[in-house]
Amino acid sequence: MIAKPVFLLAFMALPALADAKPPLRDVTEIDNELYYIAIANEISDYCPSISGRRLKAINVMLGLRSKANSLGYTDREIRAYVESDAEKDRMRAKGEAYLAQQGVTYDNLDSFCVLGRKEIDRNSAIGVYLRAN
């Protein structure tokens, strides 16, 4: 007789499991786009001849919020992800690894400009958020 209540409890928990969402960091469409914006922002912060296309980035971020909402994430969950120190650290480490792979160093600010121009010329996922001054 104990098996029946346990089965019922387990069965009642199934909808909650079905509604479980992955962490936003695992939603690549959202996480990757935020990563591209972060790299572009870093380039524009350190290269005086390149500026960020901030309105475009803001518009895309609003779209990402809408996408996350449509996937069932609340504004509170989205804010927690975006403001999380752990997520900021993860994104920074990922970005610094990419910059280093591209030969960018904080000791050579022109290296940010070289990468920025390359990204703009390629019209890459990062380059679309940059503009040469």
Where are these regions (language model features)?
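Compact alpha-helical subdomains of small soluble proteins
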Residues: 59-133
